[in-house]
Amino acid sequence: MMPVRPLIRIVLGASVALACESATAAAQGAGEKVAKAKHALDRAAEERQTKRATARFDPIFKKYTKRYFGVGTDWRWFKAQGMAESDLTPGARSRVGARGIMQLMPATYGQIRTALPGFGAIDNPEWNIAAGILHDRDLWTLWKPDVDESERWHFVFAGYNAGEGTIIRARKAASAAKLDNRTWPNIERVAPRVERWRYAETLDYVKKIRANKDSLSPR
């Protein structure tokens, strides 16, 4: 039988060890909570900073939406597009040479400048945004005769991404499949059949713009 004193020492030692473990666990838990709270605060501050940084382009999007689409058109469509194109980064460059917030190809921008000599450099945020919205307006006009307004945005942004010729071919594929080629879900349905089209990129692009728009304040 073990003597009482050694037994007491063992029990006390175990109690102290358990208390130390509990204190350590509590300290670790508190540390994790503090770290999580700090991360949340840092993230919120970063989001506020990002919103302030991108909001500086809002007056430009509003100005050229009104100029090229008229009063009543929701300017958020085009900011959402800029977010999808470049995260609203003025100096953005793509691997194929597209430039600026609206990721315009120099050849496309050159055509716009020929028609409108008042446009400045492609890397200037205002002119880049203006040119992107003007290009959207041309696509809007193209689809206007037979595509309902509620569907037309899909066709506009798809044409911007893949080229209007690709979307025309997609519409022909829908017609060949005896589907209504004026509705975007039918274009999505026949997309895999359209040759020379990286359709997954375009379909994702259109979805991303809508999601971006829904996340933006209308002010």
Describe the predicted segments one by one:
Residues 3-5, 23-43, 48-55, 110-134, ...:
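Non-catalytic cell-wall polysaccharide-engagement segments
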Residues 1-11:
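Bacterial N-terminal signal peptides that target proteins for export
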Residues 80-87, 103-114, 162-166:
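Glycine-rich, acidic and aromatic/proline-enriched surface loops and short helix-turn segments
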Residues 10-19:
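Bacterial N-terminal signal peptides
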Residues 52-55, 59-63, 67, 80:
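N-terminal targeting leaders of membrane proteins
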Residues 65-73, 145:
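Short, charged helix-capping/linker segments at alpha-helix termini
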Residues 92-112, 175-178:
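Short, surface-exposed glycine/acidic/tryptophan-bearing loops
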Residues 72-89, 132-133, 156-161, 209:
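Short, functionally critical alpha-helical segments immediately adjacent to catalytic or ligand/cofactor-binding
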